[in-house]
Amino acid sequence: MVQVTVEKVGLDQDGEQAVVLLADLTKTTLIPIWIRALEASAIALPLQGLTAPRPLTSDLVISVTERLGADVVMAIIREVKDGAFYASLVLTKNEEEIEIDCRASDAIAVALRRASPIYVMERVLVEAGIRSEEDNVQ
């Protein structure tokens, strides 16, 4: 697995689709994940240090997780199938590791809110990654 960070979140001109750019820690490889604008907002808010006036789905997931006595350990982007990214959240409770299947956008939003690391599997980096120089990312 390779650790990544959210490099950028942007909307298309219509404002209906968005892209989240994940970057490896050296910022030499980017992974664009196309998502809806609503999911982009859920990812952008914690990056800007903001919170929504009412809980979003990611906030709900965190609240339920905490109320059940579990902790969010990490998010993992596991694979790409037909352009869709498959992910999971890894939780711990009483030293037991629990993996929950979810959308990549939800995994990223939850991980950002908990300051948990985000990882991608090597094959995802190979299949979906774009080589880039840091000064080309704007």
Protein language model regions, located:
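Divalent-cation
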Residues: 1-138
